[in-house]
């Protein structure tokens, strides 16, 4: 006896043809295609694939959450050497910030992030703890969230920010003091309305605003909407005299440069476009009558002439 029948006989309910037909497994007189219905259709396979995809997505999300939780847990497990590097061990809040427990005596060490990451996080904690609204702290936090920038880049950003903060602090000094201090450095300086101005190249700059050489004047700049392509085949435009790659513009700026707006057209072109629209609406010219222009008959030509002259006579022009 085959194993399947043996299993059926040993089970409590012995399957009969009538019972299987009731389930829809065998064809009957009433339902001859019952056995075909049980084979999975394309729709069933699609639904199954969708369910599998959703399950995999959920697994991936769970894994991401677990990784982030582990990172957050290992964040505070810094060794004492990194504390001494930043001279935070003498501050009263360093133990509170680091929450250092007893170090493991065995040679086994748990996973620790790379030193640059430790340094960044230490800096971020230090800056944020001193002042919640500190722009450097906020910058560090955003960069940590990005998790893609090297430490050197972040350090240059911090230096720039610190320079900007110093410039803001110096702004409180009078213009005369600024002029005297800058003259001592041997630069060409003049007094401006709000601050001293330094001459770099052929332009006057406020202190802290010079961003490198001012490349393009409005005369030799490329067209502001179409732009040009440089030697690297990158499309670029000028923004306030600086070369800016098209791909680095914001979406709104790119959208604004997608086509020339009305202000790029001359007044004659604007009038011509308006007249074309007017003719299309009131005289029925345009693409609709293109077959009449190609295969024109005598009657159609006479009718068009009469229509045209009557429109001229009765002042149907857009500007009359």
From Swiss-Prot:
Keywords: Glycoprotein, Membrane, Signal-anchor, Superantigen, Transmembrane, Transmembrane helix
Membrane-spanning residues: 45-65
Membrane topology: Single-pass type II membrane protein
A Pfam family reported for this protein in Swiss-Prot or TrEMBL: MMTV_SAg
Topological domains, Cytoplasmic: 1-44
Extracellular side: 66-319
Superkingdom classification of source: Viruses
Gene Ontology CC entries for this record: membrane
Subcellular location: Membrane
Glycan-bearing residues: 79, 89, 93, 131, 146
Function of the molecule: Superantigen.
Protein family membership: Belongs to the mouse mammary tumor virus PR73 superantigen family.
Miscellaneous section: This protein is coded in the long terminal repeat (LTR).
Protein name: Protein PR73
Taxonomic lineage from the root: Viruses, Riboviria, Pararnavirae, Artverviricota, Revtraviricetes
């Amino acid at each position: 006896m085959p194993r399947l029948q043996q299993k059926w006989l040993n089970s409590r309910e012995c399957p009969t043809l009538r019972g299987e037909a009731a389930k829809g497994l065998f064809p009957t007189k009433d339902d001859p295609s019952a056995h075909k219905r049980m084979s999975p259709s394309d729709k069933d396979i699609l639904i199954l694939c969708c369910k599998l995809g959703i399950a995999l997505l959920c697994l991936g999300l769970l894994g991401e959450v677990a990784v982030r939780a582990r990172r957050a847990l290992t964040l505070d497990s810094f060794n004492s050497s990194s504390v001494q590097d930043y001279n935070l061990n003498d501050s009263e809040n360093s133990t509170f910030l680091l929450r250092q427990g007893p170090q493991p005596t065995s040679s086994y060490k748990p996973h620790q992030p790379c030193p640059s990451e430790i340094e960044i996080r230490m800096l971020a904690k230090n800056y944020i703890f001193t002042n919640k609204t500190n722009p450097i702290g906020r910058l560090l936090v955003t960069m940590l969230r990005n998790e893609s920038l090297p430490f050197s880049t972040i350090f240059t950003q911090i230096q720039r920010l610190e320079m900007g903060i110093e410039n803001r602090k110096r702004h409180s000094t009078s213009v005369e003091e600024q002029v005297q201090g800058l003259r001592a450095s041997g630069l060409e300086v003049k007094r401006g309305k709000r601050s001293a101005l330094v001459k770099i190249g052929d332009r006057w700059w406020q202190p802290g605003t010079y961003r490198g050489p001012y490349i393009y004047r409005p005369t030799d700049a490329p067209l502001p909407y179409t732009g040009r392509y440089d030697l690297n085949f990158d499309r670029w435009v000028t923004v306030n005299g600086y070369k800016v790659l098209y791909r680095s513009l914001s979406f709104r700026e790119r959208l604004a440069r997608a086509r020339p707006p009305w202000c790029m057209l001359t007044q004659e072109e604007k009038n011509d476009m308006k007249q074309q629209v007017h003719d299309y609406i009131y005289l029925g010219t345009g693409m609709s009558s293109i077959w009449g222009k190609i295969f024109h008959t005598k009657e159609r030509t006479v009718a068009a002439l009469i229509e045209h002259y009557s429109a001229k006579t009765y002042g149907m022009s857009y500007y009359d």
